[in-house]
Amino acid sequence: PAGPFRIPPRXRXEFQ
């Protein structure tokens, strides 16, 4: 992937 924005922020915490 090109970044953490491809997967929804479900416990990932990368969407902050």
Swiss-Prot record:
Kindly state which keywords UniProt assigns to this record, in alphabetical order.
Answer: Antibiotic, Antimicrobial, Fungicide
Share an example GO biological-process annotation for this protein.
xenobiotic metabolic process
Domain of life, per lineage? Eukaryota
Signal sequence, renumbered to the chain? none
Describe the function of this protein.
Answer: Possesses antifungal activity against F.graminearum.
Further comment found in the protein's record: Antimicrobial activity is not affected by salt concentration.
Assembly behavior: Heterodimer of a large and a small subunit.
Q: What is this protein called?
A: Antifungal protein 1 small subunit
Q: Which organism is it from?
A: Malva parviflora (Little mallow)
